[in-house]
């Protein structure tokens, strides 16, 4: 979550990636894995991000939190607010670095949700997670290798983040991107919590990723900005309303079960202009047999302006007869 908020601050220009941040006494004295920065330094945001991600530097994490929010306490408030906004219902933060604290909790599902949103919302910063080695100039050469062993074992793996405390065990949120026949590029995430060692978490993560690619098919239902449905529109300058999604609609299903998929459009009727581009009008339910897998809003792909007086009057009569 610390990385998510830092990337959000960069995106919204609250901080700049080349900007230097001071290292407080609090950051300098952080226990656990560190980047080995000290209060005599002013460190660029870009290097602090690398220290946080590659070296799991608790000192870098606190320096970033203070740089974004002014204080660790305020940053933790932002973390919890964002967790609620993202739908991480079983997560509560007590600090930005992830060290054990009473009430500091999360789940595998919430971490998967956070990782998905981070990669979707901030794709320009995802390459940070694939960096294998990093050391800030003037600091010791210790702790300069990424602890995500899959980066060194599997060329398709490009992240994401390790974690370890005595209470939580060895944890890893891993991401992989592979080119598959007749499918194209497909990304999967895995979450392993509570493993007994670095090697164990890497092995279990590898098993999960391989299983995900072999046991499930990715089925593209519609392309981005493709009209899913074109219902008639009343009192408008155009006869139909094009509804779809700005993202490709892709669903993962057990291998060989794609033929069971079906879609159901839920929308108001009649549809009376005007309609603005991007306006939500109904939804698309994706079903597998009688089971609803998920539901996405249908958005207006092309605006429909209101017709002139005569056109509206004519459609009013037709609606009344209907």
What are these regions (language model features)?
Residues 1-109, 115-123:
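Active-site-adjacent loops and short helices of periplasmic peptidoglycan-processing enzymes
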Residues 89, 100-105, 109-322:
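Domain-terminus/edge residues, biased toward the C-terminal soluble/receptor-binding domains
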